[in-house]
Amino acid sequence: ATHFYNAMPVVYKEHEFKVPGTVESVYALQDMTVETIADGIHVPPVMLHVVYQIKGVEKMALITDSLAYAACNGEVTCEPRVILEDGVCKLADHSALAGSIATMDTLIRTSILKAEIPMIDVFRMASETPAKIMGVFDRKGSIEEGKDADIIMFDKDINLTYVMQMGHEKTNCL
């Protein structure tokens, strides 16, 4: 389930009966994975922790859903009907979120510091789990002999300090 919790109905009432929504159905399907925009805006930190507790590290992947304006600050017009405001793209009429500008390091910091998910699990949800979902774990998602050398490093405050992609240092990513 991609964009988990975004534009997904939760339990609702149909006549006198309660009917499970998409969210409850996804939780009930134990084998289903979820992809969550863990920026703390699309899904609040407390809900990120709930998803982690229910689905676990093997079934929860972090995704950015970043638009072309990822990492931008301030208020800009993204498209005629979308504005960047308060760190997120919104519909111009403010009726809904329209996309994320968060980068993966932001999702990692939010998951560790605000959602209080263990660091080792957060890194797995940002690398191993997505690689398994996409069917590329034979070459991505972990540091092992024979796999692509895609490596990132953080400082003690979880700020990105080093990027290596396919064995090559990337200096324009920081």
Question: What label would you give each PLM region?
Answer:
Residues A1-N6, M60-T64:
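Non-cysteine beta-strand/loop elements that form the S-adenosyl-L-methionine
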Residues K18-T36, M47, Y52-K147, I151-F154:
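His/Asp/Glu-enriched, well-ordered alpha-helical/loop segment
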